[in-house]
Amino acid sequence: MQPLHGNCLIAYARHKYILTMVNGEYRYFNGGDLVFADASQIQVDKCVENFVLVSRDTLSLFLPMLKEEALKLHAHKKVPSLLVHHCTRDIPVFQEVAQLSQNKNLRYAEMLRKRALIFALLSVFLEDTQFIPLLLNVLQPNMRTRVCTVINNNIAHEWTLARIASELLMSPSLLKKKLREEGTSYSQLLTECRMQRALQLIVIYGVSIKRVAVSCGYHSVSYFIYVFRNYYGMTPTEYQERSAQELPNCGPAASMAAQGNFYGTDRSAEGIRL
């Protein structure tokens, strides 16, 4: 057995079950126990039907779903390495997630379904006060992720550097410095978050350009179109027309929009929240 570094795991005990910690300790679980754990602290054998590995990338996409207050929580000095939630009913989707996780050649729709089901399993732990500290302790989100989470909780707000810094309980100068160290700025992230949201509203929901502009925090439709064209290389209307042609064939526009609907694209994975 080997420890699983990076990532987290979700284990489901249909019957009595034992997990071995890296320090040699044994943890015993009863049937119906759902476990969320720091994978680096667990040793797992080759029998994988009762657990699902959750990658850092997937956790990063789950994080923006949380309210910004969650990111103000400081990890406890002694964060537990695992949490247990006892389920009174069977979890039929767990086996499906486990099977999808073992398949290395998932179709695009299967990949999205797997991600959505993992999010559903993670949500079971949201009422546990230790869940967010453990999640943050494992993920250690960078400043980009924190800023995008704040923005996406109120995408239409007139965000300024000072306002975002206030939400994150730090000075504007410190926030600016930390973002510079990560090679970005608050204005760049604000544009990225708004453009990703605009793409979702236009392609997936067919919202009018005027409503999209307002929903994304732009008072001027013409300025919104200008920013959109600079970001995507075409106007919102042109993007609508192209995506309408490609959606039946699952082309790149559909792919980009669908992935954005599940909290991110390769271009900005950290900050999309519907």
UniProtKB/Swiss-Prot annotation:
The record's listing under PANTHER family reads:
HTH-TYPE TRANSCRIPTIONAL REGULATOR GADX (PTHR47894:SF4)
**This protein is called what?**
HTH-type transcriptional regulator GadX
InterPro entries reported in the protein's UniProt record: Homeodomain-like_sf, HTH_AraC, HTH_AraC-typ_CS, Tscrpt_reg_AraC-type_HTH
Annotated HTH araC/xylS-type domain ranges read: 145-242
> Where does this protein come from, organism-wise?
Escherichia coli O127:H6 (strain E2348/69 / EPEC)
What superkingdom does the record give?
Answer: Bacteria
Q: Does the keyword Iron-sulfur apply?
A: no
Extract the GO molecular function terms from the UniProt entry.
DNA-binding transcription factor activity; transcription cis-regulatory region binding
Q: Name one GO cellular component term.
A: cytosol
Give the Pfam families listed for this entry.
Answer: HTH_18
**Keyword annotations of the record:** Activator, DNA-binding, Repressor, Transcription, Transcription regulation, Virulence
What induces the gene encoding this protein?
Expression can be activated by RpoS and repressed by CRP, H-NS and GadW, depending on the conditions.
